[in-house]
Curated annotation (Swiss-Prot):
GO terms for cellular component: cytosol. Its EC number is 3.1.-.-. PANTHER family: POLYNUCLEOTIDYL TRANSFERASE, RIBONUCLEASE H-LIKE SUPERFAMILY PROTEIN. The keyword 4Fe-4S does not apply. GO terms for biological process: rRNA 5'-end processing. This is Putative pre-16S rRNA nuclease. Keywords: Cytoplasm, Hydrolase, Nuclease, Ribosome biogenesis. Could be a nuclease involved in processing of the 5'-end of pre-16S rRNA. The lineage of its organism: Bacteria, Pseudomonadati, Pseudomonadota, Alphaproteobacteria, Caulobacterales. Its main location: cytoplasm. It comes from Phenylobacterium zucineum (strain HLK1).
Length: 156
């Protein structure tokens, strides 16, 4: 399988199975999971980045435990719509995952402003300190990304 358009993901990923959302950071990978009906995304956890094969094994283990059938990866598009080096890095991550699991459907979702929005929410509504936010922002951003993709799929 290859990277697919988000709108094609429901036809490829088996029905009534969750999807996983990823926020790829420099040091961590934020992970979120949807419910089986693909209506609600919830933060699941963090994978502390080491080497790619270990990161992928940890991700696949999380996916198997939730019976997830596809991945939505946040794509950090620049504000002007262009793709920079972080987009290239996220696309390379997806290609590398597909080398290990060829049957895995992967789609991208524009994650512009997701981390900023989550930080504002955690400061404004949850009144979290910077240290505490660091522990949750990536998995919350992954949930934000996945929820945006789920909302888009629901409104097709």
């Amino acid at each position: 399988m290859a990277v697919v358009d988000l709108i094609d993901l429901p036809a490829i990923a088996p029905p009534n199975t969750p999807l996983v959302g990823l926020d790829l950071g420099e040091k961590t990978i934020g992970v979120a999971v949807s419910d089986a009906t693909r209506m609600v995304a919830s933060p699941l956890g963090l994978i502390r980045k080491t080497k790619f094969t270990d990161d992928a094994k940890a991700l696949f283990k999380l996916m198997e435990s939730r019976r997830a059938s596809g991945i939505v990866i946040g794509l950090p598009v620049n504000m002007d719509g262009t793709e920079g080096t972080r987009c290239q890095s996220n696309r390379a991550f997806a290609r590398n995952l597909l080398r290990l699991r060829e049957d895995l459907p992967i789609a991208f979702w524009d994650e512009r402003m997701s981390t900023m929005a989550v930080n504002r929410m955690l400061v404004g509504e949850a009144d979290m300190t910077r240290a505490r936010r660091a522990d949750v922002v990536d998995k919350m951003a992954a949930a934000w990304i996945l929820q945006g993709a789920l909302d888009r799929l629901r409104n097709l």
